Amino acid sequence: MRKSKKILAVTLAAAMLCSVLPASQANAAVKHKGVCSTLKNGVLTISGKGKMPKNMKFRGNTKIKKVIIKKGVTSIPDNAFKSCKKLQSVSIPNTVKSVGSYSFYNTAIENITIPKSVKTIGAGSLCNCKLLTTVTMPGKFKVYAPNPEKNEDIMSRYDNIKSVKLNTILDISNMKYFSAMNVYIWNKDTKYKSYDGVVYSKDGKTVLGMPLKRDELAVREGCTTFDVQAVAYDSVSKDSDTFACGSLRKVIIPESIEKVVDSRNLLSKTKRAEFKVEDIIVKSKKLDGNSIALLSTCFNHIETEKFMKKFSNQIKKEDGMYISNDNVLVKYDGKAKNVVIPSYVKEIADNAFYTANVESVDIPDSVTKFGKNIFELSSIVKVNLPKNMKTISEGMFKNCSNLVDVKIP
């Protein structure tokens, strides 16, 4: 009887050691139905079945140099290895489904493979890893943020990650999380393909995603469509609707580009991206008025006159209005308070009078198409609409606080 009690006591003690003992003290493997940890000669081995307990954290442990998580473990908790400053190597099995927030924050890992089984990745999980250069990870995942008031970055734009290599199909909205110089698409992805670390459609005809750390985007010759989402991203914080690639300073658009699109309406957001691009080189001579208007909105920090000179063969200026060869009013940048649009204009592009200092605008009957947010944030007071206009376009008078008179024939 005494012998049985002794065995039971030892078993219970081992189980308690396995689940809660810090790695700095656990120097022997202990069998247990849950998840166990063993630290020996700088190698931390985590084994068992199920989730790592929330209290199984090794934060700040400087004895850990390598982490091996065995098959059967299904999750890594928040802050699990945070500030283990000597941790250089991590092995994660394909049974793991979630990686907690700040789990590898401020470690010395140089590369990491997050298996394709992972569906949730915590905010800050790979931030402040100054030696990290290569990340292999899924392209489709959700981000878990323990504090929704803070941003959801999983990598830091201030670190040195050179390449993100995807091991599953890409969810294009996740491009906002890849703070790297290059993103390489999984070779079995049927929708996307990488060229020189930039994401394009599978056929290479549309540029769709630029890695966040690049300072120059040279769109490949042969690409025919420039999608705004290549350089604008959904927000990862509560402070804005979209954000721009903060590193981007130069954009080169080749001769092959025929149109510019905003497939996800990123430029229609209330708090839109603000770019710091210093130079845009446009070699294409095929762009229509709407394409030029989208580029103008996308890079609206560039002085309008300076920007429009890049399209000297495709646009003319008349009374402060930039009008394309296909008769689209692209932008107004004049000083006149009262504007009369010429009778040959057929369309007014998105954001044409955005923030314009105008009081009245006469729109002729020749105009049959109206873009989004035409007068947004302008000082417009009075507008005369054309006879054939049956509906007000989306956001046409958005945030026009001075508007008092809209004449509808």
Specify the residue positions occupied by each region the protein language model found.
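Consensus positions within tandem repeat domains that build extended binding/scaffold surfaces
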Residues: 78-80, 100-103, 122-127, 154, ...
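Structural signature of tandem-repeat unit edges
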Residues: 40-51, 62-75, 85-98, 107-120, ...
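Sec-dependent signal peptide cleavage junction
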Residues: 18-32
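His/Asp/Glu-rich metal-coordinating catalytic cores
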Residues: 56
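Beta-solenoid repeat scaffold
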Residues: 59-60, 200-203
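Short N-terminal segments immediately surrounding and downstream of signal-peptide cleavage
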Residues: 31-40
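Bacterial N-terminal signal peptides that target proteins for export
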Residues: 1-11
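Bacterial N-terminal signal peptides
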Residues: 11-19
